Every structure is written in C-alpha cells, then in structure tokens.
Amino acid sequence: MLKDTLVIWGGEFGRTPFGQYNSGNSKKPNGRDHFGRAFSWVMAGGGIKPGSIYGETDEFGWNITKGRVHVHDMQATILHLCGIDHEKLTFRYQGRQFRLSDVHGHVVKGLLA
C-alpha cells in the first residue's frame, strides 16, 4: 500500500533550537518560537527514497549547511510525486506568473527513489 500512497508530516517552518523564556519565569522555558530557517518533514512511500535524510544544519540547528530546501521546492516535489507537473499549474494575474510552487520552486530530486 505504501508504494501507491504518499505520507507526509511536517510544516513550512520549524521551531527555534532553544527554549524561549518569559520575563516572569526565567528558570523554565515556556516553549519555542517559529523558526523559518530550518524545518523537518517526515515523508514515506509514493516514490520517496526510503531511509534517507536530506539536508543538514550546523551543530546548533541554526543555519542550513547542506541541502537547503524552500517550501516551494517541497510543494513542487509533492506535486511531482502525485503525477502533476507543477509548472503547468501556472496562471497569470496582474502581469505576474503564479503557481503553488511559485516561479522558483524545483523538484528535490535527492528525495526521489
């Protein structure tokens, strides 16, 4: 079943690699803030290379050091795995080209089986 099914869990932003503290309680972190530099997705089946990890951050989880992927690249990759050419989903509005993967999204071939 996993051969024909694409399973995805993730989001377009991660969380800061350190806890956030509020001013009233400096001893215990109360969570983590949104973090747009790095994010994690779990993907399985449907043409994804099994058992692989794509991309790396530095030892602090702050900067991407290898395999930078934009959310538009993820959208292009998901559409590709569903058999849809993301570049054909383009429409023009007020003189600009629009599509789900924006005009600079690319399929991340390193994720494909």
Report each predicted region and the residues it spans.
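Ligand-binding pockets and gating/stacking loops
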Residues: M1-A113
